[in-house]
From Swiss-Prot:
Protein name (Swiss-Prot/TrEMBL): Toxin Co52
Tissue-specific expression: Expressed by the venom gland.
UniProt xrefs under CDD domains: neurotoxins_LC_scorpion
Originating species: Centruroides ornatus
BP term (GO), one: defense response
One GO CC annotation: extracellular region
């Protein structure tokens, strides 16, 4: 299990605006294919705890965002 920023389909951080507890990020992190245990908004990106090892996290190699 790992912690990290979720990435969107472009490979950049999944954005959020309401910092701290954030229902959107929490829901996104807990999707079955993502496997996170908790999510919140930190630095305007959705940060997840307890992700499965197969879930990509930001920054991705060779991405400039």
């Amino acid at each position: 299990k790992e912690d990290g920023y979720l990435v969107d389909k472009t490979g950049c951080k999944k954005s959020c605006y309401k910092l701290g507890e954030n229902d959107y990020c929490n829901r996104e992190c807990k999707w079955k294919h993502v496997g996170g245990s908790y999510g919140y908004c930190y630095g305007f990106g959705c940060y997840c705890e307890g992700l499965s090892d197969s879930t990509p996290t930001w920054p991705l190699p060779n991405k400039t965002c």
